[in-house]
Regions:
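Active-site/ligand-binding surface loops and adjacent short beta/alpha elements
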Residues: 41-101
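Acidic, serine/threonine-rich low-complexity disordered tracts
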Residues: 1-41, 86-191
C-alpha cells in the first residue's frame, strides 16, 4: 500500500493572471519535500523573477532565476488551461504551455482528443472535452500520454475527472462539488 498526500497551493493576480506565489507539500510514502516560488513582476519586460526554495530530507536549497511570463507552476498552468478556447479546437490540436517544475521550465503541450460523456461515482453525468497533456517522463509515468483530463464542456472549463496510469498502478480524481462559477454549470447533465 503506497500513501500519497500532496498539497498544491497557488496564488494568481486577478489583474494580470500572472502567478504570484506557489507552495507544494509532497508526502509520498516515506518521501517528503516542500517547494515554494515567490514571483516578482517588474512590469518592464516579458519575464518574472522567481525566488525558489526547495526543502527535503537532505537539506534546503534556495536559488533565484528569471522565467518567461508564459511559464508558471502546476496549479497556475491548470488555471491557464481553463481559459483555452476549446470551441475553436479540433481533435488532435495541441495547445502549447510552459510549466515550471522545481527550477526547470518544460515546454509541453495539451492535446485535445475530443468530447466524451463522463459518469462519476455519485451518478452525476457531465459533457466533457478530453485532453492529454504531454508529460515529463520519469519516476511516476511510463509513457508521455499516461494522463487524461476531462474538462466540463461549458464556459467554466472546470476539471471533472482525471485518470492517470502510473508505474505502480492507476490514480483517479473526480469532482465532488463546485460553487461560485462565473457561468451557469451547463456541462452537468440532468439526471
Amino acid at each position: 500500500f503506497y500513501v500519497v498526500r500532496d498539497t498544491f497551493t497557488s496564488y494568481i493576480s486577478k489583474k494580470t493572471l500572472l502567478p504570484v506565489y506557489y507552495h507544494d507539500g509532497k508526502h509520498e510514502d516515506s518521501y517528503w519535500s516542500y517547494s515554494t516560488y515567490l514571483y516578482t513582476d517588474n512590469g518592464k519586460n516579458d519575464s518574472l523573477h522567481v525566488n525558489f526554495e526547495y526543502i527535503k530530507r537532505k537539506g534546503t536549497s534556495r536559488t533565484e532565476f528569471n522565467i518567461s511570463k508564459k511559464a508558471c507552476d502546476l496549479v497556475a498552468t491548470c488555471y491557464k488551461i481553463r481559459n483555452l478556447d476549446v470551441a475553436s479546437m479540433s481533435r488532435g490540436d495541441v495547445a502549447a504551455f510552459s510549466l515550471l517544475f522545481e527550477d526547470i521550465v518544460y515546454e509541453l503541450g495539451l492535446k485535445f482528443t475530443g468530447k466524451e460523456n463522463v459518469k462519476l461515482k455519485d451518478g452525476s453525468k457531465y459533457r466533457t472535452s478530453v485532453f492529454v497533456p504531454t508529460l515529463i517522463k520519469g519516476d511516476l509515468f511510463k509513457n508521455d500520454e499516461d494522463l487524461k483530463v476531462y474538462v466540463a464542456d461549458d464556459d467554466n472549463h472546470y476539471p471533472v475527472y482525471v485518470e492517470a496510469s502510473l508505474k505502480m498502478g492507476k490514480a483517479v480524481a473526480s469532482l465532488e462539488s463546485i460553487t461560485g462559477t462565473k457561468y451557469e454549470l451547463s456541462g452537468k447533465k440532468k439526471k
